[in-house]
UniProtKB/Swiss-Prot annotation:
Quaternary structure note: Forms a heteromeric complex with ERLIN1. In complex with ERLIN1, interacts with RNF170. Interacts with activated ITPR1, independently of the degree of ITPR1 polyubiquitination. Interacts with SCAP, INSIG1, SREBF1 and SREBF2 under cholesterol sufficiency conditions; indicative for an association with the SCAP-SREBP-INSIG complex. Probably part of an AMFR/gp78 and INSIG1-containing ubiquitin ligase complex involved in ERAD of HMGCR. Interacts with TMUB1; TMUB1 bridges the association with AMFR. Interacts with SYVN1 and RNF139. Interacts with TMEM259. Interacts with TMEM41B.
Keyword annotations from UniProtKB, A to Z: Acetylation, Cholesterol metabolism, Endoplasmic reticulum, Glycoprotein, Lipid metabolism, Membrane, Signal-anchor, Steroid metabolism, Sterol metabolism, Transmembrane, Transmembrane helix
Record localization: Endoplasmic reticulum membrane
Listed GO CC annotations: cytosol; endoplasmic reticulum membrane; membrane raft; plasma membrane; protein-containing complex
Protein name per UniProt: Erlin-2
Membrane topology reported for the UniProt record: Single-pass type II membrane protein
Record-linked CDD domains: SPFH_like_u3 (cd03406)
N6-acetyllysine: residues bearing it: 267
């Protein structure tokens, strides 16, 4: 009975071990490939739990999602004979699920070593061998990533279709310390030069700004002066027009006044001409004699009132020449009076 129990225990252990080795799990984003007796089987499996023959069948999980392969410490000799090292080169790639079997069959499950790592070493050495340290370290460094990606993808398209390179990232290479210090000094001087150039641009920009401000200020002053000059010219023109209008009005008034005076004089002359009739002259004579308070004596006094009209006119004319001949200049002869 003891032997039977031992056999059962051994059988149970063997069964459990067989079951444990037969059941396996494939993670999401991976494809399982199987080997039996060292030969790759054509069947593959997706994510999940699967069974296989225990002890004689083995499997490997191949990632089909994006993965990053790192190639470290890649030596590279430039055309000038300087040895430099790239610390780390990252290659982002993914494998198409349908191409897993062919790639694993041709390049094993560690296909990245044959297709990516070796190719990176080869392409970098070719690139460095035809370029100087200045070009590799500074001038063409930004092109290394894209050149490696294109070269890798071109070879993989013909050698391993289904393996896609998405991106390549290259770190700055390590160069000899003396050369590195020279480059740092050169970069420092270049930075100083750039700073000086930027300062010069700033100064030039400020000077240009000041010049534009001065130009704008001068234009403003000129415009103000032009406007002020225009205003003064308009004021003078207005004053001139006002003066011309006033002069014209004054001339018109004076002319009208002169015309009126001339007209008045003409009318007075015409009226006087019409008034100088014998009857009017005789009336004026009588008024003059009547208004004279002095009495004249002489033989011609009665005749003054008895002359004809023609004689009166002549006497009046003579009187007008001698201030009406009424003795305005000569002293009158007064008759002597007797006192009672």
């Amino acid at each position: 009975m003891a032997q039977l129990g031992a056999v059962v225990a051994v059988a149970s252990s063997f069964f459990c071990a067989s079951l444990f080795s037969a059941v396996h799990k494939i993670e999401e984003g991976h494809i399982g490939v199987y080997y039996r007796g060292g030969a790759l089987l054509t069947s593959t499996s997706g994510p999940g739990f699967h069974l296989m023959l225990p002890f004689i069948t083995s499997y490997k999980s191949v990632q089909t999602t994006l993965q990053t392969d790192e190639v470290k410490n890649v030596p590279c000799g430039t055309s000038g004979g300087v040895m430099i090292y790239f610390d780390r080169i990252e290659v982002v790639n993914f494998l198409v699920p349908n191409a897993v079997y062919d790639i694993v069959k041709n390049y094993t499950a560690d296909y990245d070593k044959a297709l990516i790592f070796n190719k990176i070493h080869h392409e970098l050495n070719q690139f460095c061998s035809v370029h100087t340290l200045q070009e590799v370290y500074i001038e063409l460094f930004d092109q290394i990533d894209e050149n490696l990606k294109l070269a890798l993808q071109q070879d993989l398209t013909s050698m391993a279709p289904g393996l896609v390179i998405q991106a390549v990232r290259v770190t700055k290479p390590n160069i000899p310390e003396a050369i590195r210090r020279n480059y740092e000094l050169m970069e420092s001087e270049k930075t100083k030069l750039l700073i000086a150039a930027q300062k010069q641009k700033v100064v030039e920009k400020e000077a240009e700004t000041e010049r534009k401000k001065a130009l704008i200020e001068a234009e403003k002053v000129a415009q103000v002066a032009e406007i002020t000059y225009g205003q003064k010219v308009m004021e003078k023109e207005t004053e001139k027009k006002i003066s011309e209008i006033e002069d014209a009005a004054f001339l018109a008034r004076e002319k009208a006044k002169a015309d009126a005076e001339c007209y008045t004089a003409l009318k007075i002359a015409e009226a006087n001409k019409l008034k100088l009739t014998p009857e009017y002259l005789q009336l004026m004579k009588y008024k003059a004699i009547a208004s004279n308070s002095k009495i004249y004596f002489g033989k011609d006094i009665p005749n003054m009132f008895m002359d004809s009209a023609g004689g009166l006119g002549k006497q009046f004319e003579g009187l007008s020449d001698d201030k009406l001949g009424f003795g305005l200049e000569d002293e009158p002869l007064e008759a002597p009076t007797k006192e009672n």
